[in-house]
């Protein structure tokens, strides 16, 4: 083992930083814990927000774990693993990012104690993996046997939004909008849910209580020409993926003109080509045109003359939503325009908000896209509202599509911890200690919840366990200035099961990955 | 540093910045550098091996247990150390696994060589001895190896599991081993002479983050990470005719810059019409071929996209070249590089499914003579799946080589101890100082069980002694169970390695050690970093040709 001691020989490039053995483990674990520590105060209905200021002075105020970690400018490589965990959580299920990060941190903290007790890292890894398996079983058992009606989904959305800065609207109004939005577009003909169909658009001004659900698409666009109608009802819609402009050939072409007549002919030809677009659209009975590319000013004029409302440079994602809302096809050419290529909507109207005009496209024939139009006093308010709503949409979808719901408020975690402890006794070898440590780590979630609510964490935990023992269900319900132990289902605190599963999975994988490292080699 | 110049007034014949290290100093320098490399990876060896976290200058993080990945990412700046890294790379290319073992053995060989050098044994004698031993060791591996039936799935799974233990893929090794063995069996064909040929070109690995590793799956077919070019295209086909196209569906342009002068709008119109007609014609050719799905390696013009969508054809543009090649195997289609000469015969058949959440296409071949499977690996984060992929790739190589080679060995240090004991017997028959080198070689091989024990927190000497005793009793398969610390039949315990990887490890470790030993002079134009050029290192391989014949002497052992 002890190699011959000599002058150390450097085989690595100069400036390379290397730590190994216990010090590498310590440094990684400390970094992981520090990250978890940073977000834990945001957990739960009484969690607080963070204000993050970036290097250019931009301010973000948020309660959302993934956003905090992303903006925190974290450099330590192991800490980045935790950021990744919260990002995966965000991408997969859209919520529970703080939970995942806190759980990873707790798992690392307990791993540190186990390493002190001389448990080999691979044993800890085995134990944690085993415990995660038990946890998944426990989650299975906790899945509530209820029908996912609107009422229940609203509770799920509400649970996700509590503690976030949802402005002066109480969460229940927003939850109603969210659930309705998701239900309206939930499944298309193939039985597939497209998350993009629920769109969120924000606009400052008014108060957040002015938030509304638009059954269609809201575009941040103005008509290309002032003379176009500002509102059209019962309209035929075309969505174009082509330029309404003079066509140019792929080869460079150049007029070589010797007489005035030739010039006139060229100008006339262009003119009639441009008129042709407006005519083709008017003939097809189109009332509103959404174009993802440019529209020549002259064409805009002709369209206005024909009484057609047109928008140019519409974003691809907007065009997609418009197509899904109105049933229109996206056209790359007008030459073979057919009635079936066009869509229909009840109304298109331009509404002014401050200096901006927004186009509301409502009541589409296909009705496959809806927009949550969020209002709020300031930029920061709507931004945070948007994050909360996006998360709420995700959890509602997760509840419908990914296996149902479990009680929230720490109740599921208590059940997991209890199950792991009782099964731990049957596990042979040192692994058992790691399995038990996992139970402790999971309990850190209700503990943090209690702490943030203003309860004594130890008392709360003991009460929770006792109540779970007798009634099989116990969570932390915030009330007044503190909290109490209660039945979360009765009080409507419900989480999608997918969020819990993903948090357990990704926290375990990240923590075990970090525990296995005994050597960190960082290039300059 | 001990780069002392020769005493006396030096005669300077080199550039001012040049550095020169000679004789014992050079040997010492080289050996230490090589050992430092070996030292860096040895803690990753075995089921209780640990991982390394590597951070590059951009701040990108790699977490791995894979020897060759560690060495590649380590930013090594020393000419000798880089030669050792090459050992790992060769091992990876040839055998796909056992890179850590190869490097660790190379380091140990050099350590033992150092002792021999101290006893005034000339490097050429050591090299000859190492060569003899390596030759002999490979013969013995073939002798010890057990022939297996390539259809024995249980055994193949054990081989895959052994390769994965100690890596993060271990946590789901039953599932993954099953997937790997099934994948390899899908692409194995029996040649006329009864040997098995595995074409790993037909196994592709795709990774996806989200969900856990236990939800990884094996798909018969390809996973194409692309979107349709147009939203209105159909994306699900039970039975589609697939066209693979290596020609842009765009207006043809000359390579030379052309500039057309026209005089009237009619002329312009003709150009425009002609261009449109050209696109239309290309689309018509695709339609006429009967294709439902087009994977194009090049671009597709916007207007052509529109026409294709109208015809209800699914088109994907800028498909990766490797994907096209894979699709060719799966669908049985030929790649069309000129639409003018398209025939129905070149189309392949496949079912196409769309995974909206993952934005992927699953393409599955229809028919008997289609080969091609995709291992879809999942893990919670990028780093998890990356490491999973490395582990699975290695296991895949190992299983493939087992099927092709048909020989396996007991792992857990069993083979190394057995080899060492046989080499020691053989050493007695070697005359001259080479005998000592052969013995040193035997000692070096025993590094593997020693490190296995060390990484598991066991006493390495006790373990080694127990193992030696067991092998003395004729228990060829006796290996170390690192979980219990007991010596047991490794084969029965499911620790099975391929003979091919072991042979390669022995061979490349010896050659690298010999290469380093032969050097007695390092001349660097600048300082001794690899920013400058390498020194001389050409001599060693040539010296080995003559040694082959002698190895045969002890063959009947």
UniProtKB/Swiss-Prot annotation, chain A:
Entry keywords, A to Z: ATP-binding, Chaperone, Nucleotide-binding, Stress response
Domain of life: Archaea
Expression induction: By heat shock (at protein level).
Stretch forming the signal peptide: none
Keyword ATP-binding: yes
GO terms assigned for molecular function: ATP binding; ATP hydrolysis activity; ATP-dependent protein folding chaperone; unfolded protein binding
Disulfide bonds: none
SUPFAM superfamilies for this protein: GroEL apical domain-like (SSF52029), GroEL equatorial domain-like (SSF48592), GroEL-intermediate domain like (SSF54849)
Any Pfam family the entry gives: Cpn60_TCP1
Quaternary context: The thermosome or CCT complex is a oligomeric complex of two octameric double-ring structures; the complex is probably a heterooligomer of CCT1, CCT2 and CCT3 with yet unknown stoichiometry.
Function: Molecular chaperone that assists in the folding or refolding of nascent or denatured proteins along with ATP hydrolysis. ATPase activity is highest in thermosome assemblies containing CCT1:CCT2, followed by assemblies containing CCT1:CCT2:CCT3. Not required for thermosome ATPase activity. Not required for growth.
Family: Belongs to the TCP-1 chaperonin family.
Miscellaneous notes: Cannot be stably overexpressed.
Stored NCBIfam families: thermosome_alpha, thermosome_arch, thermosome_beta
Protein name listed in UniProt: Thermosome subunit 3
Organism: Haloferax volcanii (strain ATCC 29605 / DSM 3757 / JCM 8879 / NBRC 14742 / NCIMB 2012 / VKM B-1768 / DS2)
UniProtKB/Swiss-Prot annotation, chain B:
Ranges of Gly residues composition bias in the record: 539-557
Induction of the gene: By heat shock (at protein level).
Gene3D superfamilies: GroEL (3.50.7.10), GroEL-like equatorial domain (1.10.560.10), TCP-1-like chaperonin intermediate domain (3.30.260.10)
Any Pfam family: Cpn60_TCP1
Coiled coil residues, start to end: none
Keyword Transmembrane among UniProt keywords: no
Homology family: Belongs to the TCP-1 chaperonin family.
Entry function: Molecular chaperone that assists in the folding or refolding of nascent or denatured proteins along with ATP hydrolysis. ATPase activity is highest in thermosome assemblies containing CCT1:CCT2, followed by assemblies containing CCT1:CCT2:CCT3. Seems to contribute to thermosome ATPase activity. Not required for growth.
Record protein name field: Thermosome subunit 2
Protein species of origin: Haloferax volcanii (strain ATCC 29605 / DSM 3757 / JCM 8879 / NBRC 14742 / NCIMB 2012 / VKM B-1768 / DS2) (Halobacterium volcanii)
Origin organism lineage: Archaea, Methanobacteriati, Methanobacteriota, Stenosarchaea group, Halobacteria
Gene assigned in the entry: cct2
């Amino acid at each position: 083992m002890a190699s011959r001691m000599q002058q150390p020989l450097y085989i690595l490039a100069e400036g390379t930083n290397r730590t190994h053995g216990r010090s590498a483990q310590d440094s990684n674990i400390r970094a992981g814990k520090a990250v978890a520590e940073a977000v834990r105060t945001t957990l739960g209905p009484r969690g607080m927000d963070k204000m993050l200021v970036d290097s250019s002075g931009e301010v973000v105020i948020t309660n959302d774990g993934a956003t905090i970690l992303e903006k925190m400018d974290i450099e330590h490589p192991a800490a980045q693993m935790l950021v990744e965990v919260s990002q995966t959580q965000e991408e997969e299920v859209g919520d529970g990012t703080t939970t995942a990060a806190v759980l990873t941190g707790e798992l690392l903290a307990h791993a540190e104690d186990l390493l002190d007790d001389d448990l080999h890292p691979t044993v800890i890894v085995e134990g944690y993996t085993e415990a995660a398996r038990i946890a998944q079983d426990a989650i299975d058992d906790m899945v509530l046997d209820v029908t996912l009606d609107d009422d229940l989904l609203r509770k799920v959305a509400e649970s996700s939004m509590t503690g976030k800065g949802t402005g002066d609207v109480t969460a229940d109004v927003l939850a109603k909008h969210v659930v309705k939005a998701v239900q309206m577009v939930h499944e298309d003909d193939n039985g597939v849910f497209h998350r993009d169909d629920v769109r969120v658009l924000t606009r400052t001004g008014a108060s957040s209580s002015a938030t509304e659900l638009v059954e269609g698409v809201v575009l941040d666009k103005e008509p290309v020409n002032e003379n176009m109608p500002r509102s059209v009802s019962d309209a035929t819609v075309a969505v174009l993926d082509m330029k309404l402009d003079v066509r140019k050939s792929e080869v460079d072409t150049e007029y070589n003109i010797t007489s005035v007549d030739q010039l006139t002919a060229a100008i006339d030809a262009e003119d009639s080509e441009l008129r042709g677009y407006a005519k083709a659209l008017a003939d097809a009975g189109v009332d509103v045109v959404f174009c993802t590319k440019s529209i020549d000013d002259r064409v805009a004029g002709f369209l206005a003359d024909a009484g057609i409302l047109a928008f140019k440079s519409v974003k691809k994602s907007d065009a997609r939503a418009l197509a899904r809302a109105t049933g229109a096809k996206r056209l790359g050419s007008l030459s073979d325009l057919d009635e079936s290529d066009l869509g229909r909507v009840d109304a298109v109207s331009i509404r002014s908000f401050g200096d901006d005009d927004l186009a509301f496209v409502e009541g589409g024939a296909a009705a496959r896209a809806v927009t949550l139009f969020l209002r709020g006093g300031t930029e920061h308010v709507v931004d945070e509202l948007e994050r909360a709503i996006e998360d709420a949409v995700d959890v509602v979808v997760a509840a419908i599509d990914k296996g149902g719901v479990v009680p929230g408020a720490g109740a599921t975690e208590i059940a997991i911890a209890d199950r792991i402890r009782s099964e731990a006794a049957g596990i042979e070898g040192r692994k058992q200690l790691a399995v038990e440590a996992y139970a402790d780590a999971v309990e850190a979630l209700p503990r943090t919840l209690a702490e943030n609510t203003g309860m004594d964490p130890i008392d709360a935990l003991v009460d929770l366990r006792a109540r779970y023992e007798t009634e099989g269900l116990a969570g932390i319900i915030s009330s007044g200035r503190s909290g109490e132990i209660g039945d979360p289902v009765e009080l409507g605190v419900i989480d999608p099961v997918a969020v819990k599963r993903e948090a357990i999975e990704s926290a375990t994988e990240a923590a075990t990955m970090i525990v296995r490292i005994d050597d960190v080699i960082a290039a300059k | 540093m001990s780069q002392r110049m020769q005493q006396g007034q030096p005669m300077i014949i080199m550039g001012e910045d040049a550095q020169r290290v000679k004789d014992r100093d050079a040997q010492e320098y080289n050996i230490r550098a090589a050992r430092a490399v070996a030292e860096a990876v040895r803690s990753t060896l075995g089921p209780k091996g640990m991982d390394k976290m590597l951070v590059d200058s951009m701040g990108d993080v790699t977490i791995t247990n894979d020897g060759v990945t560690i060495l590649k990412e380590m930013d090594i700046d020393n000419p000798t150390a880089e030669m050792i890294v090459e050992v790992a790379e060769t091992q990876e290319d040839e055998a796909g696994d056992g890179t850590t073992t190869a490097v660790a053995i190379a380091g140990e060989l050099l350590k033992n060589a150092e002792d021999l050098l101290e006893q005034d044994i000339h490097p050429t004698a050591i090299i000859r001895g190492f060569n003899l031993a390596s030759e002999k060791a490979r013969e013995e591996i073939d002798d010890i190896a057990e022939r297996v039936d390539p259809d024995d799935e249980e055994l193949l799974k054990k081989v895959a599991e052994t390769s994965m233990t100690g890596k993060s893929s271990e946590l789901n090794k039953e599932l993954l081993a099953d997937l790997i063995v099934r994948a390899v069996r899908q692409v194995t064909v029996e040649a006329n002479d009864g040997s098995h040929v595995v074409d790993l070109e037909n196994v592709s690995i795709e990774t996806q983050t989200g969900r856990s590793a236990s939800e990884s799956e094996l798909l018969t077919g390809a996973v194409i990470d692309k979107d349709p070019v147009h939203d209105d295209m159909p994306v699900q086909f039970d039975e589609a005719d697939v066209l693979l196209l290596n020609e842009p569906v765009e207006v043809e342009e000359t390579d030379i810059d052309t500039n057309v002068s026209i005089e009237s709008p009619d002329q312009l119109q003709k150009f425009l019409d002609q261009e449109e007609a050209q696109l239309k014609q290309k689309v018509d050719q695709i339609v006429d071929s009967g294709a439902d799905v087009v994977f194009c390696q090049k671009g597709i013009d916007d207007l052509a996209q529109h026409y294709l969508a109208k015809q209800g054809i699914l088109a994907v543009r800028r498909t990766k070249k490797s994907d096209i090649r894979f699709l060719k195997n799966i669908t049985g289609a030929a790649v069309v590089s000129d639409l003018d000469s398209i025939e129905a015969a070149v189309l392949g058949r496949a079912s196409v499914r769309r995974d909206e959440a993952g934005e992927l296409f699953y393409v599955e071949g229809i028919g008997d003579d289609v080969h091609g499977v995709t291992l879809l690996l999942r893990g919670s984060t990028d780093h998890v799946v990356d490491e999973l992929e490395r582990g699975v790739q290695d296991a895949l190589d190992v299983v493939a080589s087992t099927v092709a080679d048909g020989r396996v060995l007991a792992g857990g240090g069993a083979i190394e101890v057995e080899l060492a004991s046989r080499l020691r017997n053989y050493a007695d028959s070697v005359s001259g100082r080479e005998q000592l080198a052969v013995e040193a070689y035997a000692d070096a091989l025993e590094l593997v069980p020693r490190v296995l024990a060390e990484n598991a927190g066991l006493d390495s000497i006790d373990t080694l002694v127990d193992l030696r005793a067991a092998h003395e009793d004729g228990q060829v398969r006796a290996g170390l169970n690192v979980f219990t610390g007991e010596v047991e039949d490794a084969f029965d315990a499911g620790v099975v390695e391929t003979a091919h990887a072991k042979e390669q490890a022995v061979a490349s470790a010896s050659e690298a050690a010999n290469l380093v030993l032969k050097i007695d002079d390092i001349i660097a134009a600048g300082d001794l970093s690899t920013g400058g050029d390498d020194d001389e290192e050409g001599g060693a391989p040539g010296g080995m040709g003559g040694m082959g014949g002698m190895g045969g002497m002890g063959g009947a052992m």
